[in-house]
């Protein structure tokens, strides 16, 4: 008899015999009154006689369950009480006899470094049983058992749908897991085993298998669960959470009649995903996007980085604007009061100079072009004679030729002399003297 079988059939010795209920008996307590108190049993020397007395009561029940196990030495109970640490037992809420939930609290103390972790899941319908993580146990048949997934409280955990008649021994095949690689097992967190309804091996299933509901993932998939509340011991949230196997079905697992899978098949290894990697990348496409809305929304906002600030405007060069304006032609309507610009003095002077030049050009075009032929002939003229010439001017400024004798010279009112042909041609287009720029017509009026 193994220690966990003894722990399953263990009852308090102080209860009367008429109030004790054997393992195989159905529970007659109403469903709304069923609740398992968070009591943890301590293993000691004073409890061992009671364990042996209750062992004979459940011998027939456990003999059928563990008939296919290999014999384990009797000193196995000593190995389960190593280091002076007592295994802890948790009780689940009472379920109907045909479908019960088993909650297991893993041992807190483990060896440092890489140790082989293997634990046994047995077919019991009682309140609870202890599980240790230091005893290697033979492997189970993977085809006889459906795949298990892990769902810890607040993190990833083990969620196992197992028909009770089909479970003989479910162990992990000596998985070497280090302390850092599996923190939920070492931090004494809880995982829940939900067995599915029992199906006889030679009877057809009660109803055809149906796909899992849309809000739950199918079997053989690992589902990351996002914690919504801080983690706390299971005893504190027992009044708020009702863990029932019939409220959390994950699908129907059945076998065809008169068909048994092979006996020895390697078990499917379980995978553990740390909490920090669940929200970064998933090992499978997410078919249920509503399960992680808050984290995905947070990543979406984190990926949107703020836009860079716009580039600053180009600097203002005060000397460029007047130069550009001076290159443009000034229209006639632009003549008027000067536009006051807050510029340098040199720029203002240059702008005024350009404006004056433009104004002079416009005024010059507006005045009369030249003298008439009658006005030109009224100017005095004479023949040049070198002997009686009294003026110091001996050169015509228009043609740059010296005066010769017997040439006709014309004298302007400013007393400047020119060749008659040269100055007449100039006066037809201009009204001023070519040397002093004096007005020839005004001087002519004064002489008259």
Swiss-Prot record:
The keyword Nucleotide-binding belongs to this UniProt entry's keyword annotation: no
InterPro entries assigned to the protein according to its UniProt record, in alphabetical order: Znf_RING, Znf_RING/FYVE/PHD
Coiled coil segments of this chain: none
Keyword Transport attributed: no
Matches recorded under Pfam families: zf-RING_2
BP terms from Gene Ontology: protein ubiquitination
Keywords: Metal-binding, Zinc, Zinc-finger
UniProt zinc finger (RING-type) residues: 396-437
Protein name as annotated: RING finger protein 44
